[in-house]
Amino acid sequence: MVKTFEMKLGGRPFVVEIGKVAELAQGSCMIKYGDTTVLVTACASKEPKEGLDFFPLSCDYEEKLYAVGKIPGGFIKRESRPSEKATLTARLIDRPIRPLFPKGYHNDVQVIATVLSMDQDCPPDISAMIGSSIALSVSNIPFMGPTASVSVGMIDGEYIVNPTSKQKEDSTLELIVSGTKNAIMMIEAGANELTEAQILDAIMFAHEEIKKIVAFIENIVSEVGKPKSEVIAKQMDSNLLTEVVIFLDTKLANAIKTFDKTERNENIQAVSAEALDYFEEKYEGRSKEVHDILSMLIKVETRKMITSEGIRPDNRKLDEIRPISTQVGILPRAHGTGLFNRGETQVLTITTLGDLRDAQRIDGIGEEDEKRYMHHYNFPPYSVGETRFMRGPSRREIGHGALVERALLPMIPSKEDFPYAIRLVSEVLTCNGSSSQASVCGSTLSLMDAGVPIKRMVAGIAMGLIKEDDQVVILSDIQGMEDALGDMDLKVAGTEEGITAMQMDIKIAGIDRGIMETALEQARIGRLHILNKMKESITSPRIELSSYAPKVTQIKVHPDKVREVIGAGGKVINKIIDETGCKITIENDGTIYVAAPDQESSRRAVEMIELIVKDPVVGEVYTGKVIKIMDFGAFVEILPGKEGLVHISNLAHERVTKVTDVLAEGDLIEVKLMEINPQGKIGLSRKALLPKPETKSETQSE
């Protein structure tokens, strides 16, 4: 039986249908938000996967082009690999729900959200995120939700729930928040230098809306929800645990307190290997149990060391930033480079400038758009001393690249001020935590080295959290071990003026306003420290671009002149391109961008365009080319694409019988523009520039 539920969300109807489609899935729902329709399903395997020490959750977000009435391009004519937007949305679905499955639950769980119809003003990503919570909550899958999600914008200081596409253009904030009725679970934000207080107020505003949606979902579950499956978690053998603890004594604690990462890992591995060998000999076939106990003890010991003793794995204070060093201009042929080192994390970011035709065209189910500023993040296996197959960017790499891109976006100059396409690539060379925020810092240095006039410098910092009962410890600039064993990963990027990007993921059941407020203030202090260290290498963008970068010149012509510049079938513009070697981009408003390999080519191309759009002026003298000879005169091209007639009577003072007696096609002659008639036809004279012959009376008087 079909059940329909409805509430208002952002002033628009939000409708949930249960039992209409996909009934063989353990949980499913059809979300209708305006004209946006999203089908979300949740399925789980009947049996857990043996030998796993992680929860095998997969979330997929499918964009179907029929949702916006499009047929896929290319030869195959069907949707292929997910777009970057689809990958990022899949991550948004995954992150808030992952912490809410029972510990020890290792069944395969798959959530699939399929966009069936798309309304630009009703975001399908939010519909998919809420739908995933509903599908899991009404199913028999042991999900400890529900969660809910909203998007928040800010216009003139006012917060807006799920802003429309038009409102997003005017908004200084793009925030997505997920949470339960009691706590925040996930944050993704881009902002135009907002203060910590403004961001925090926006998060709390979002949480109030989340509470309403959660209550709505709880009502749905009370009516159509299925009983949850029982999770029988494998219990740790307490006797074996005691034996391992006694065997280790203080060895594990001493190994963890080794400050160098490589040496610490080696010491921990040595202690673990010793314990595994001992207990394998004592209890044959129980190595897996001993390994699980060791992993648990490493986590417990590290967290206890931080919370009780105030000692971090590398002996830093809780709010201390690792040593920072920076360098710019290290690759001779690159347009800009920045090398950023923070502790054992090292990122090299390279800037490449191109003409506007190098901008990325975005063609999905959203509005068609172009992206002239791009950031790509690469995390090769050697950065952590490992091996793995390299088969294109992972979801994590795409997500980190998008975060760094968002952090710098408000500082990128407009197309009018800097008419270039900009691509940044961050190569993580060594990683011990906070590589995405090191990429933010490296990108700032690289852009400035390339001469991109960014408005202000941007830096990023990753914050961590260890929460044991009522004891809360917030860590600045977390390293890899603290990230893996901690309860929160909060990334904050911004300038001296405010926050430009933020991302938060947690592994516990949520955090409150007090923790968020403390973490943001601690992040602000750390960010300002990092910005000051970055200024030791470069303080402002370089005045001149690299000699290897294209030279882009912007000129403005009247829109009516665009046709003349292009010419019939592109004849005129192609001639300029062929003669100068430049790339030329023309926009409908009359803006022309000339990208040249060198300054001389740029000058020639601009000069040719200016001649084309220049209007002939009566009384001006021009050097023109004879392009056609007739019985009654000659046609002379005085400007590119503009020709006039020199009548036979205006060729010379004396009588001319045949035009060919004076001129030949291809001759260059000087002419004076005498008139432009109402039909736009141009009258020229050669005679007006020739000296008048002496008269008979003048000759006799001499």
Curated annotation (Swiss-Prot):
Organism: Alkaliphilus metalliredigens (strain QYMF)
Gene3D superfamilies: GHMP Kinase, N-terminal domain (3.30.230.70), K Homology domain, type 1 (3.30.1370.10), Nucleic acid-binding proteins (2.40.50.140)
Stretches assigned to coiled coil: none
Keywords assigned by UniProt, alphabetized: Cytoplasm, Magnesium, Metal-binding, Nucleotidyltransferase, RNA-binding, Transferase
UniProt function note: Involved in mRNA degradation. Catalyzes the phosphorolysis of single-stranded polyribonucleotides processively in the 3'- to 5'-direction.
Residue numbers binding Mg(2+): 483, 489
InterPro entries: ExoRNase_PH_dom1, ExoRNase_PH_dom2, ExoRNase_PH_dom2_sf, KH_dom, KH_dom_type_1, KH_dom_type_1_sf, NA-bd_OB-fold, PNPase
Catalytic activities: RNA(n+1) + phosphate = RNA(n) + a ribonucleoside 5'-diphosphate
Family recorded in the similarity comment: Belongs to the polyribonucleotide nucleotidyltransferase family.
HAMAP family in alphabetical order: PNPase (MF_01595)
Location in the cell: Cytoplasm
Primary gene name: pnp3
GO molecular function terms listed in the Swiss-Prot or TrEMBL record: 3'-5'-RNA exonuclease activity; magnesium ion binding; polyribonucleotide nucleotidyltransferase activity; RNA binding
Record-given protein name: Polyribonucleotide nucleotidyltransferase 3
